[in-house]
Amino acid sequence: MKLTCVLVVLLLVLPFGDLITTSNTEDNKRGATPWQNSLKARGVCSTPEGSCVHNGCICQNAPCCHASGCNWANVCPGFLWDKN
């Protein structure tokens, strides 16, 4: 039972790990990883002014997309790979 609880918590937290552990400021940017670059290359994300076409996210600060959809609030706070 404890193992099941741990696995459930990990599955809930892991998709948002990047949002939790990284600061999303202009002077603290990370480069895009190959996986993130391939998202753009496949056309999953479309970045017109503040919107994501394929997943319907509403963006607050910058064009942003995520392959599996929006975050828990249906709002993307500006993912790091879209600011490069």
UniProtKB/Swiss-Prot annotation:
Q: Which GO terms describe its molecular function?
A: ion channel inhibitor activity; toxin activity
The known PTMs are summarized as: Contains 4 disulfide bonds.
- Which protein are we looking at? Mu-conotoxin-like Cal 12.2d
Keyword vocabulary terms for this entry? Bromination, Disulfide bond, Hydroxylation, Ion channel impairing toxin, Neurotoxin, Secreted, Signal, Toxin
> Which of the residues bear the PTM 4-hydroxyproline?
77
Identify the stretch annotated as signal peptide in this record.
1-19
Q: List where in the cell it is found.
A: Secreted
Give the comment on domains.
The cysteine framework is XII (C-C-C-C-CC-C-C).
Q: Which domain of life is it from?
A: Eukaryota
The terms describing its cellular component in GO are: extracellular region
Q: Which organism is it from?
A: Californiconus californicus
The tissues where this chain's protein is expressed are given as: Expressed by the venom duct.
Propeptide residues are 20-42
Instruction: Please give the family membership noted in the entry.
Output: Belongs to the conotoxin O1 superfamily.
Q: What job does the chain carry out?
A: Mu-conotoxins block voltage-gated sodium channels. This toxin reversibly blocks voltage-gated sodium channel in cephalopods, with no alteration in the voltage dependence of sodium conductance or on the kinetics of inactivation.
Q: Which residues carry this modification: 6'-bromotryptophan?
A: 72, 81
Give yes or no: UniProt keyword Disulfide bond. yes
